[in-house]
C-alpha cells in the first residue's frame, strides 16, 4: 500500500464520517433511528451506490465491528446504574437466555419454510438474528424517560443476551461444518457455561483490576480514558480467546467502573461519549459498504416476511414466555418490551461467522441478517416514540443539566458541577434563593444573568434565562430535577403523576373521608402503603399505578426503592359531570 492509497483512504474515510455527522439531524426530523442514517451513507458509498466503492473484506468488517461494539458496551456499562438490577436483573437474564432460545427456534422454523432450508440451517438463521443489539438499544433509548422496570430490562437484556446468540451460532456452525461434531447434552452445557461463566468472571475480575489500576496510579487526566479503553479491550479479547463472551465481559467491566468511585470517571465518560459516536458511525458505515443492495432485492419479499414474522410472532412469544414468572410486568409493558427487540450490528457480525467458515448459503445468511436489521431499525426504531405513548411506559421527562463536570478535589471525588438554564415555565422563576430548599449538602456556586456573574444572596430572585451552577453529587440529581422541573410539553404527561399527592404513611380512613370513599372493615385500619403493597408488590417503580374505588393511584415518588408519595389521578371533568347527572 503506497502513500497515495493511504492518503485516499484517509480522505474517503473522513468524508464519509463527516457526511454521516452532518446528516445526523435528519434522523430526528424524519423520525428514523440515527443508526439507519449511518447505514444508508455506507450503502450509498458502496458498489451499488453513487460512491462505487467495492468492499467485500469480511475479516476487516468483523474487526471493525467488534472493536466498535466493545467501545459501545464499555460506555453503556459505565452509564448503567447497578441499582436498576433490583427490578430488572432476573427478567433480563430470562430474556437473554430463554427469550433468545425461543426467538431463535421460532424464527428458524419460519426461515426454514420461507427459504427451503434444512432445520439446522433455518435455526442458524434464527440464532444469527435472535439477540437484541446493545448499540441500537442504547442509542435509541438514550435520553428517553421510560418506566425504570422496562427501560432497565431492555438495556440489561441487550448487554447480556449476546453470549446466548454467539453460543447457538458457533455451535450450529460447528455442526453444519463437520458431520463429526458431537452434539451431546454435555457438549452444549459446557459451551453454554463457558460463554457465560468465563465472560462474567473475566468481566468482573478484570474490571476490578482495571478499577484498582486507575485509582492506584496518578496520571495526566487524558490518560485515564486511554487506560480504561485499553484495559476494557484487553478483557474483551482475553475473554474471547478463552472461549467466553467478550461482549458480556466488557459490559460488566464498564458496569463495575461506572458504579464504583473511580478516579476521573467523568473525564473517562466524556471521552467515551465521543468514541462511542465514532464507533457507531464507523461500524455502520463499514456494514453498509459490505452489503450489495441489488442482492437484497432478490430476497426482499421472503426477507420482509421473515422480519415481520420475527417482530410480530417470534419476539412477542419469547417475551411473554420469558417474563411469565415476573408478575410485576403488566401486559402493556410486555408488549412494549416485545416491540423494542431492536436488531443492529450484532446480527450482521454473527452473519460474518458462516462467511468466514465457508458454509453453504453463507451469503444468504448475511443478506437475511442485514435485511432483518434494516426492517427492525425502520419499523421498530421509527415507531419507538409512538409505542412508548401507546404502552403508557413514558414518564414525564426529567430536566437534565445542560452541562455537568466532575470536580476532582480528591482521587475518588463524587462531587460535580451541574449547570442549569432556567426557562419561563420553571416554577422557581421569581422565587428568592432562600426558598429553593436545596438538597442537603448541595450549594449554588454561581448565578449568571445576561452573561454577567452575580453576587447572589438569599433574597436574590431568579429570572428567566438565569444560569445556575450547582455543586452536588449524582445522588442529588433526582431532587435537583424536581427542584428545577418544568411543565411537560405533552398534555397527556402534564398530570401523569396525579392531581393530588398523598404521603405513603397516610391512613386509608383519612383518605376515604377526604375523597368520599366507602371502605370495608379490613381497609379502615390500613395505611396507603399497605394498599400499594397489595396492588403493586414489593418493588414498584415510578409511574406504576392501579385502580381502586374508581380512581387511579400513581407512584409519584420513590426514594431508595421505597415509595414515599402516591398521586391521585381524578377522572376527567366530563366523566365527573356525567357521574353527577
Swiss-Prot record:
GO terms for molecular function: flavin adenine dinucleotide binding; potassium:proton antiporter activity. It catalyses: K(+)(in) + H(+)(out) = K(+)(out) + H(+)(in). One of its GO terms (cellular component) is plasma membrane. Optimum pH is 7.75. Inactive below pH 6.5. It is a multi-pass membrane protein. SMART domains: CorC_HlyC. InterPro entries: Cation/H_exchanger_TM, FAD-bd_PCMH-like_sf, Na+/solute_symporter_sf, NhaP2, RCK_C, RCK_C_sf, Transptr-assoc_dom. Signal peptide: none annotated. Keywords: Antiport, Cell inner membrane, Cell membrane, Ion transport, Membrane, Potassium, Potassium transport, Transmembrane, Transmembrane helix, Transport. K(+)/H(+) antiporter that extrudes potassium in exchange for external protons and maintains the internal concentration of potassium under toxic levels. In vitro, can also catalyze Rb(+)/H(+), Na(+)/H(+) and, possibly, Li(+)/K(+) exchange, but not Li(+)/H(+) exchange. Nonelectrogenic antiporter that exchanges one cation per proton. HAMAP family: NhaP2. This is K(+)/H(+) antiporter NhaP2. The lineage of its organism: Bacteria, Pseudomonadati, Pseudomonadota, Gammaproteobacteria, Vibrionales. The gene is nhaP2.
